[in-house]
Regions:
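P-loop NTPase Walker
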Residues: 1-79, 179, 233, 237
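Short, intrinsically disordered, charge-balanced linker/junction segments flanking boundaries
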Residues: 239-242
Length: 242
């Protein structure tokens, strides 16, 4: 479903969930609704409950990160203490900048930009050997990226992109775990689909298979709201993929 801002896209999702439950006899626990922000997920849940006149049904509403982290928690026993705080990630990059004796003009800005680039490489599933940094030489970026990954691993920490990458790897390597989640979530609905990145899309495609009951809502002209690494062309190619 493609439509502009304020046209009722969210309403379409909540009404579709109601229709699936009431008209199609779908088990509420097998429905997964994914959004991009925690606030959007909470609002969607509230609107759905209001629509159902207060009936609390076990439909899952959550962000990509919340949904995928819950999958990782069950597989690897992770908990909230494993999620890196922003200052921890920043400190790792700053220590690497000192270690590599890099001369940067504005350390805070440079650190922020490098973390954004690391996120982009993970989210778009890029090969590090073919990524050209906008902020430093390819050789230095590779050292920063690898140093960051090692430090995170040594500390037992995950960033938000790791949640996605690890979930992708888990589903790729453990068909039994993938099948269990495919059987749990038989109907998947996604809001603001134009903000999706490559790794999120690949996980969703695996999770939705083999039934492919995938319902997406987005605005093909919302590039101004683009999330980190979002690829609007994924949405535009959706009909070709399915």
């Amino acid at each position: 479903v493609l439509a502009g801002p304020g046209s009722g896209k969210t309403t379409v999702i909540t009404h579709r969930v109601k229709y699936l439950v009431e008209q199609c006899g779908v088990e509420p626990g097998s429905i997964l609704v994914i959004t991009f922000t925690k606030a959007a997920a909470q609002e969607m849940r509230q609107r759905f409950e209001k629509l159902m006149e207060g009936r609390r049904l076990p439909v899952s509403f959550g962000t990509f990160h919340a949904v995928f982290f819950s999958i990782l928690k069950r597989a690897y026993r992770y908990d909230a203490s494993n999620i890196a705080r922003e200052e921890q990630r920043t400190r790792i990059i700053r220590e690497l900048v000192d270690k590599l004796r890099m001369d940067v003009e504005d350390e805070a800005e440079f650190t922020s930009q490098i973390l954004t680039e690391i996120s982009l490489v993970k989210g778009e599933m890029m090969d590090l050997d073919y990524y050209y940094s906008k902020n430093c030489s390819e050789e230095l970026f590779k050292k920063l990226y690898q140093g960051y990954e090692k430090a995170m691993m040594d500390k037992g920490l995950l960033d938000f992109d790791d949640m996605l990458v690890l979930c992708y790897e888990l589903f790729t390597q453990r068909k039994d775990i993938l099948t269990a989640w495919q059987n749990k979530y038989r109907y998947i609905l996604i809001d603001e689909f134009q903000d999706i990145n490559r790794v999120q899309y690949e996980i969703v495609r695996m999770l939705a298979a083999p039934r492919n009951n995938l319902f997406i809502v987005g605005d093909d002209d919302q590039s101004i709201y683009r999330f980190r690494g979002a690829k609007p062309e994924i949405m535009l190619g959706f009909e070709k993929d399915y």
